[in-house]
Amino acid sequence: MSDIIKEIEEAWQIKENILNDSLKLIKLKSILNESIKSLNQGIIRVCEKQGNQWKVNEWVKKAILLYFITTESQLYNNNYNSWYDKVAPKFPADTDKNIFKEAAIRKVPGAIVRTGTYIAKNVVIMPSFINIGAYIDEGTMIDTWATIGSCAQIGKNCHISGGSGIGGVLEPLQAKPVIIEDNCFVGARSEIAEGIIVEEGSVISMGVFIGSSTKIVYRDTGKIIYGRIPAYSVVVPGVLPSPEAGKPGLYCVVIVKQVDKTTRAKVSINDLLR
């Protein structure tokens, strides 16, 4: 793997001129195809947890961006649609049913998954869009019209509800994508973007919008944080009143309660939100 990383880092330094060197381009394309294959298999990933911290593997992002630079668009077809793209579908129309059986996943009509995406066992993909570099762990459901952005990381046993958006990021290289840790619920029509981390066991209500500048308010103390939802939080949309009379309040999200792991496992999502 160290040799592949070295080759990608060197190619990145000359990316503006890489198309002009046919010999280097042939070698690089082989390396990039192997990298995309490794992303598909979950051997490598854009972002991974080391201890309590998430680390971005910048070289993997560089590999994806170089793949865009060095790949020409082509026409793709399935039984009901055609499109013109640089990135092939992960599951083309002629995918053998045994591949789905062995992978133990379910994919319904209208589900679009680009190559370079890892889909673990027992994942259910409703009509939705999952972009290159995304990582979807075991037992998760990507519900109808949900969008999973490039490089977004979704943990085990999550439910990404209908119409919700999970932001991704390829550039800047050092930026984290959105990370949804294990056993999380993201409510319908919610949007989680700009590198937000939703920690394990959290429940995000319907219609919650969280970006890097969104105030995240603890209801019981009034404390304000940014950038992450603490583990086992229950979050709803809210408004912070203006300190000046007659001025409009501003949108925020509110941590209405935090529960322990045992309670989260026993209590239904609806009960937690109430």
Swiss-Prot record:
One of its GO terms (cellular component) is cytoplasm. The keyword DNA-binding does not apply. It is an enzyme of class 2 (transferase). Disulfide bonds: none annotated. GO terms for biological process: diaminopimelate biosynthetic process; lysine biosynthetic process via diaminopimelate. Its main location: cytoplasm. Substrate binds at residues 106, 143. Belongs to the transferase hexapeptide repeat family. It is found in: Cytoplasm. It comes from Rickettsia typhi (strain ATCC VR-144 / Wilmington). It holds the Pfam family THDPS_N_2. Keywords: Acyltransferase, Amino-acid biosynthesis, Cytoplasm, Diaminopimelate biosynthesis, Lysine biosynthesis, Repeat, Transferase. Homotrimer. GO terms for molecular function: 2,3,4,5-tetrahydropyridine-2,6-dicarboxylate N-succinyltransferase activity. This is 2,3,4,5-tetrahydropyridine-2,6-dicarboxylate N-succinyltransferase. Gene3D superfamilies: Hexapeptide repeat proteins (2.160.10.10), Tetrahydrodipicolinate-N-succinyltransferase, N-terminal domain (1.10.166.10). InterPro entries: DapD_Trfase_Hexpep_rpt_fam (IPR005664), Hexapep (IPR001451), THP_succinylTrfase_dom1 (IPR023180), THP_succinylTrfase_N_sf (IPR037133), Trans_hexapeptide_repeat (IPR050179), Trimer_LpxA-like_sf (IPR011004). Its EC number is 2.3.1.117. Signal peptide: none annotated. Pathway: Amino-acid biosynthesis; L-lysine biosynthesis via DAP pathway; LL-2,6-diaminopimelate from (S)-tetrahydrodipicolinate (succinylase route): step 1/3. It catalyses: (S)-2,3,4,5-tetrahydrodipicolinate + succinyl-CoA + H2O = (S)-2-succinylamino-6-oxoheptanedioate + CoA.
